[in-house]
Amino acid sequence: MVLEKVFLPEGVQDLLMKDCHHRRLIEGRLMEEWVKQGYMEVSSPTLEYYDLFRQGEQMLRGNKMFKLIDAKGDLLVLRPDGTLPIARMVATKMKDMVYPLKICYIQDIFRLDQEQAGKQREFRQAGVEVFGVESYEADGQVIITAIESLKALGLSDFQIEIGQTKILQSILDSMAVTTDEKDEIIMLIHNKNFSTLESLLEKLDIDPKTRLILKEIPNLFGTPQGVMESVAALPINDNIKRALEELQQICHMIQAYGFGQYISVDLGMTAPLGYYTGIIFKGFTKDLGTILCSGGRYDRLLMSFGMNCPATGFALLIDQIRKALHLGQQKKKESGPPYYLLVSHEGRHEEVAKEATRLKKTGCIVEVSLLKDPQAIDIYAKRRGVDKIIEIGEKK
């Protein structure tokens, strides 16, 4: 009988050598890129209080989190989100630092989130956050950083879809409908369920102009210019106009950096987490149906910790990026340093040690063979991807 404990729980996975190496390369390249841009790395604990994620606008669903009780009887969770703990750290430990404050991190997230991580319950997340700036330039710079990060990893066939939560929120705030009805409207727009949305809107007692805009919002996606032209024909109010101007400024900024081909606009995009207050965005590739990155503005989040501080940021899903690189065959040839296998004959240990030291100083990977049979050595070298076998001494 096979013991059940040899199998993995649902939603987690083992990473073998090649995958670990590839993930390490991805994370190293991201951190190198971000440090060059002035971001500073922090790390939050794996365990947090449950209440941190269940208050106000940042509320996460309890059934999406992994909960446990400590020895004192306090309810804890495995970190289900990357942004909230960083916001807590900034508000409680970094108030006196120089702002704008640019933070980056790489850490594991534990959450059942099919949109962002498929069926994975544990996923690796790398992110950046900018605190203390309330401007479209900060949002634009964050999206540019996301694009530069994906390009630095070797991805080219990707698209960043940009949305604006202020538009839909402005419309919903003006409607005399229940919270459940608002939530249903948001869900239907998010899923682009046109027929059901239209049926629901016909039943609700709302202004005809509002009904028209809500019907059209799921259709408003595509190039920035095309979407703006379509919106101009709708009866929008001043709040929506200001939100659209902000979105347009961000798109112009990204285009000025030469990244216009990577962006599109989707006014029907909704935020999966409730703390977003403005611009939001998601990144995809054609080869992979899941999200590679997501982010946006969350100006009210730190108020929960007694600090009034605007913020914006994004997170990359490392494992999804690994898959995208593999599926799209876009990964740059990570040949890495030369890999040599030293084979010692006649007990020439001193010569082997000198040669190994010399090669290591040049940045090579050097392994001293523990095998003696020539055929076994050849098989081992091929399977390990060794570039060259170096023999020290003469074969007997």
From Swiss-Prot:
The keyword Amino-acid biosynthesis applies. Pfam families: tRNA-synt_His. It is found in: Cytoplasm. InterPro entries: aa-tRNA-synth_II, aa-tRNA-synth_II/BPL/LPL, HisRS-like_core, HisRS/HisZ, HisZ. Disulfide bonds: none annotated. PROSITE patterns: AA_TRNA_LIGASE_II. SUPFAM superfamilies: Class II aaRS and biotin synthetases (SSF55681). Pathway: Amino-acid biosynthesis; L-histidine biosynthesis; L-histidine from 5-phospho-alpha-D-ribose 1-diphosphate: step 1/9. Keywords: Amino-acid biosynthesis, Cytoplasm, Histidine biosynthesis. Its main location: cytoplasm. One of its GO terms (biological process) is histidyl-tRNA aminoacylation. GO terms for molecular function: catalytic activity, acting on a protein; histidine-tRNA ligase activity; transferase activity. One of its GO terms (cellular component) is cytoplasm. This function is generally fulfilled by the C-terminal part of HisG, which is missing in some bacteria such as this one. Heteromultimer composed of HisG and HisZ subunits. Belongs to the class-II aminoacyl-tRNA synthetase family. HisZ subfamily. Required for the first step of histidine biosynthesis. May allow the feedback regulation of ATP phosphoribosyltransferase activity by histidine. This is ATP phosphoribosyltransferase regulatory subunit. It comes from Alkaliphilus metalliredigens (strain QYMF).
